[in-house]
Design a protein with these regions (language model features):
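Conserved P-loop NTPase "ATPase switch" module shared by AAA+ and STAND
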Residues: 43-46, 62-81, 85, 108
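C-terminal alpha-helical "lid" subdomain
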Residues: 151-213
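Walker A/P-loop
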Residues: 11-42, 55-61
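Pre-Walker A (pre-P-loop) alpha-helix and adjacent loop at the N terminus of AAA/AAA+ ATPase modules
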Residues: 1-12
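Conserved AAA+ ATPase "SRH/arginine-finger" region at the nucleotide-binding site
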Residues: 123-138, 145-159
């Protein structure tokens, strides 16, 4: 994800993987790191995709660097907004602006939900060209020049995240007790993820503050 200060060479990036693994947090971290150097983020939602070219036209000559950011991006079978996004990424005859980059995060590797019939490429009376349909849907993800996978940590890595966060927030609980409670916490809070670790530490910090009152 680094390299922004060197220029926007890789214009389109997709961060995909399991929920709670830090995709959105990474984007926020980039903004915090480079804000003073002129980085700004514009968050776009699916219903706004048809207006993205107009947005880019308005910001391409400004003295800032912009990330157009789409969080938790995915499309259902009936949605067509992905076609607008493909058109934006591909661009027209004009040169793509050097100060605009597109980032998206998603829990889906292919962004667009596939039907079982799509995967099997089974044609029926309603879709005589199912193979073409499959390729059209899957082609969106290939427009992202850089695709970065975020996987869940294993138990050892999860515990290391908990230790690191505990030290950062000044948690005083003994380590054995801390890790035992963390293991119990993740069972009912989404499993072994960075998000679960952060939520657990937030809970512990709040509990310790209450005890000190």
């Amino acid at each position: 994800l680094a390299g922004i200060e060197m220029g926007f060479v890789e214009l389109v990036k997709l961060l995909f993987g399991d929920a709670g693994t830090g995709k959105s947090s990474s984007i926020k971290g980039i903004l915090n790191q480079y804000y003073d150097q002129g980085l700004r983020i514009i968050e776009a939602y699916k219903h706004q995709f048809q207006d993205l070219n107009e947005v880019i036209a308005q910001i391409k000559n400004r003295n800032y660097r912009f990330i157009i950011y789409m969080d938790d991006l995915s499309f259902e079978e009936f949605e067509i907004e992905y076609k607008y996004l493909k058109a934006v990424i591909e661009g027209g005859l004009e040169k793509k602006p050097d100060n605009v980059l597109i980032y998206a995060t998603s829990n889906r590797r292919n962004l667009v939900r596939e039907r079982a019939a799509d995967k099997l490429e089974i044609a029926d009376e309603d879709d005589l060209h199912s193979s073409d349909t499959v390729q059209e849907k899957l082609s969106l993800v290939y427009r992202f020049g850089v695709r970065i996978y975020f996987g869940k940590p294993d138990k050892k890595q999860f515990q290391e995240i908990v230790r690191t966060l505990a030290a950062r927030y000044g948690v005083t609980m003994p380590e054995d007790e801390l890790l035992l409670k963390a293991n119990q916490w993740e069972l009912s809070h989404g499993g072994l993820t960075g998000r679960a670790a952060q939520q657990f530490i937030d809970y512990i910090v709040g509990t310790e503050e209450e005890k000190r009152k």
